[in-house]
Amino acid sequence: MGRCTIADVAMLIRWRVSLMVAGATFFGAMLAVPHVTITHLLASLATFLLAGGCSAINQVQEADLDAVIPRTASRPIPCGRIGHMYGSLMGLALVTVGWMVLCLAGGLTSLLVGIGIVAVYNGLYTPLKRRTSFALLVGAAAGAMPPVVGWLAVGGHPASPMLVVVYTLYLLWQIPHFWLHAARDREAYRKARLPLPLLSLPHERYARLLKVWFHAYAVAVLMVPAFPLLEGVGMRIMVTLCGIALLFAAMLAVRKRRVALHIADAVLCAVMVVLLIDRLAIPVSLF
């Protein structure tokens, strides 16, 4: 193992992604209880630790794949700056501490959810990536859980329509987001022999399937103003426009990949902000 730096550790835990996971957890907690408590902060810290631990373990599991994909080849394990044992121990330590903090924040239910996330992501999704082109469906199920963790940790009802809609939004967003990102490294994924849909399916079928996911994502967004989840008329109009933007992005998904990706990501952020503003009862005027 070569010399390990703080930058290497940050790359190992993918701190930006982990921070976004923590933000999604905080968002879910604020939707359930719209004022900040210590539980909000502990749940967010717990998911940051869990995301970092899952990332470290994942990079140990996929070190051989990371080495042949340009986007990931500079990660510390493929480059030899961090050894497999060190990466595994760090990942397990972060996950363990994350579980402890999550149990402190939300009790046994939150702990079980946290254990389930790690089991699905590292135990199912990561190995399945080498076997089936639709492993992302499994990974997305775990990836959509951070808002749920936050919601449950602060005592939100598990069968709330708001929670179901938010989980669905995160779930459906991940598929086109990942597929559009993967298109950038198409040849590297082919070299790594990963059975992604854009490689294993004929182009026409892949394009149709990508559009179907965009349409499903758009429908989920349009469900928000259709159901009594928003109080303000202005908020409903904003979310409706977001859904229309996704329908437009579906038409660009194949020809203008980067534009479609930016729209998909921006819509998720916009809907999160709208839901939070509406929940906090912040007055907003469109005119």
From Swiss-Prot:
Where do the TM regions start and end? Answer: 19-39, 100-120, 134-154, 162-182, 212-232, 233-253, 267-287
Q: GO:BP terms for this protein?
A: heme O biosynthetic process
What this protein catalyses is: heme b + (2E,6E)-farnesyl diphosphate + H2O = Fe(II)-heme o + diphosphate
Q: Membrane topology for this entry?
A: Multi-pass membrane protein
Question: Can the keyword Membrane be found in this entry's annotation?
Answer: yes
The protein's GO terms of the molecular function aspect are: protoheme IX farnesyltransferase activity
Q: Which Enzyme Commission number(s) are on file for it?
A: 2.5.1.141
EC category: transferase
Matching entries from InterPro entries are given as:
Protohaem_IX_farnesylTrfase, UbiA_prenyltransferase, UbiA_sf
Keyword annotations for this protein, in alphabetical order, are: Cell inner membrane, Cell membrane, Heme biosynthesis, Membrane, Transferase, Transmembrane, Transmembrane helix
| Pathway assignment | Porphyrin-containing compound metabolism; heme O biosynthesis; heme O from protoheme: step 1/1
Q: Which GO terms describe its cellular component?
A: plasma membrane
- What family is this? Belongs to the UbiA prenyltransferase family. Protoheme IX farnesyltransferase subfamily.
Q: Which PANTHER family match?
A: 4-HYDROXYBENZOATE SOLANESYLTRANSFERASE, PROTOHEME IX FARNESYLTRANSFERASE, MITOCHONDRIAL
Q: What else is known?
A: Carbon 2 of the heme B porphyrin ring is defined according to the Fischer nomenclature.
What is the designated name of this protein?
Protoheme IX farnesyltransferase
Organism of origin = Nitratidesulfovibrio vulgaris (strain DP4) (Desulfovibrio vulgaris)
